[in-house]
């Protein structure tokens, strides 16, 4: 059975685990570097990117996760995970993995009280819109030449792919729609 690691330090990791199970794969909660070994893909959940970055450093996960993605294994970051995957973060020196050639702006849609849901058109997932749950969501402000823009909302880039790396500003794990998780799991050889 396909094992998918889910960084389980803070944030919506349980919801991602349920989504991975619903897609027929086995979720593995990652809290230590050795737990990555058998995983064929990794999800970095939403939560608070600064806190997750500090916890990754404290648990010696930064380099193993960076290596995991640099070796070409699939990594999917949602919300805070998008921020952590970015090469650059506007007005911030916070810890990041720097795996994707993107620049992001944190909290681009406002504060917690400004959280919202919207229908998002994601052509690679078909004609039916995706329900996007935005909670203090980032957005991408610049992409490198190897980055494909998969979706935007209000002219802000919210879903990108670079090879086997996927980053989204919203929380697909908080909905019953598994299309984005299935799309990501198809990255696995």
From Swiss-Prot:
GO biological process: glutamine catabolic process; pyridoxal phosphate biosynthetic process; pyridoxine metabolic process
Residues the record lists as binding L-glutamine: 47-49, 106, 135-136
Superkingdom in the source lineage: Bacteria
Cleaved signal peptide residues: none
Catalytic activity, EC: 4.3.3.6, 3.5.1.2
Function: Catalyzes the hydrolysis of glutamine to glutamate and ammonia as part of the biosynthesis of pyridoxal 5'-phosphate. The resulting ammonia molecule is channeled to the active site of PdxS.
Record text on subunit structure and interactions: In the presence of PdxS, forms a dodecamer of heterodimers. Only shows activity in the heterodimer.
UniProt-recorded name of the protein: Pyridoxal 5'-phosphate synthase subunit PdxT
Natural source organism: Desulforudis audaxviator (strain MP104C)
